[in-house]
Amino acid sequence: MGEKLICNNKKAFHDFFIEERFEAGMVLKGTEVKSLRDGKANLNDSFALIRNGEIFLHNLHINPYAFGNRENHDPDRLRKLLMHKKEIEKLFGKIREKGYSVVPLRLYFKNGLAKVELGLAKGKKLYDKREDMKKKDQSREMAQALREKSKSH
């Protein structure tokens, strides 16, 4: 079956250095799964917190299912993530270090199950963001120059 991407968190790559990646399952309601299959989710400004040895995803917005009834879900509810205890303990140890946080990078279906890819992230300073933008601009200009050169030949 493979993977089917639902959404990416491009803002996370702009605002953070991603040091390590983890995969986690999600505890969802039926209407949430149907909404995700329609691609109706937003990862911007979402983050994960660990409480009592369990990990929860905050600010993940999943639009209400269009054909749902009164049993439809709350779009911004807290969602529990499913990970091995050792992985959660490893994340918790890293989070206690200054400057680390856990952010979702992408949401996808893997073999029919909804998964979220979490990144152990460290915040970027303003000058780091500027540096990344300069590199991106330079690579874009180089690619454009190469295209122009290949067109002229």
From Swiss-Prot:
Renumbered residue ranges of the record's region Disordered: 129-153
A Gene Ontology BP annotation from the UniProt entry: trans-translation
GO molecular function: RNA binding
Subcellular location: Cytoplasm
CDD domains associated with the record: SmpB (cd09294)
Free-text function comment from the UniProt entry: Required for rescue of stalled ribosomes mediated by trans-translation. Binds to transfer-messenger RNA (tmRNA), required for stable association of tmRNA with ribosomes. tmRNA and SmpB together mimic tRNA shape, replacing the anticodon stem-loop with SmpB. tmRNA is encoded by the ssrA gene; the 2 termini fold to resemble tRNA(Ala) and it encodes a 'tag peptide', a short internal open reading frame. During trans-translation Ala-aminoacylated tmRNA acts like a tRNA, entering the A-site of stalled ribosomes, displacing the stalled mRNA.
NCBIfam families per record: PRK05422.1 (NF003843), smpB (TIGR00086)
Name of the protein: SsrA-binding protein
